[in-house]
Amino acid sequence: MHLVRGFVLVATLSWSATVEAAEPRSPPPKVFESGHTATPATATSKAPVDQLIPWLLSEDRELREIPFNEVIVRVTGKKMVACDPKNQIDERVVKSISAACDETVKRLNAPDSAIKNIARINEVSGHFEDMLRELLNATPGLNCDFPRTAQGRVMRSGYPDLRIVDLASKRVFYLDPKLYAAGSRDSSFRAFYFEPKIATNKVRDDAVHFIAGFEHEPREKSGRWNFTRWDLVDLAQFRVKLKAEFQGSNHDMYRPEAIVATSAK
């Protein structure tokens, strides 16, 4: 949503630790992702930014306790299906994912693991995605790959990371691996985000949505990472909050015409 040159409104959905009573809220201003209002601006109508700012301030800049399944439906038009432990298909897929998680931890904890010399945990995530994809795609009866956008593009960034298909039923399961440090399980810091954009949307099926959370200990002096447990989380009851912020890049800030002084060479 382009509001002011060099700035965009970013919607970030993150884990919400506290449950708050739902309150009636005013509808958001009718501003589209492109930055256009629902009707052409006139001398008496307000510009998009003039509509948006008062609404953000009145909502305390955050919307809390939003059901993530409703976000998915509104943004993508696809339903989020709850995992049913009594359903044979769900049970079979959960069992296969569990086995893949066990094997992933085993392989990436090995002394000769590819992640041994990676210093930043954020750079380890891709190895979990690749390993889970490889193992699940090799599981009889399943297909696992990176989800594609409507234009057929593979995007590694953004939610979700993996798309699993049960070949017999053609049902789809989305899987998003997350890594977290031991002791931070109850942290209120952001651990999840979803950016609602049509062009980069990767949720294109009615599906079960899973998070696979892997816990790790502090990195050892030898450079080794040790993962100690994992949990498979159904996001059907997941609630999120929306936080709006205005942001700009270095390119936006350091424009030649905006620089008023510079250090001596």
Predicted regions and their residues:
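Bacterial N-terminal signal peptides
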Residues: 6-15
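Interdomain/boundary linker segments immediately adjacent to catalytic/signaling cores
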Residues: 28-131
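Positively charged n-region of N-terminal signal peptides that target proteins for export
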Residues: 1-5
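Short, charged, amphipathic alpha-helix that recurs within catalytic cores of restriction-modification
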Residues: 180-216
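Domain-level recognition of nuclease-like catalytic cores that cleave nucleotide substrates
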Residues: 203-264
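A short acidic/basic microdomain associated with nuclease active sites
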Residues: 129, 133-165, 169
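Boundary at the C-terminal end of the N-terminal hydrophobic targeting segment
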Residues: 16-24
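Conserved catalytic cores of phosphodiester-cleaving nucleases, focusing on short active-site segments
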Residues: 162-164, 173-181
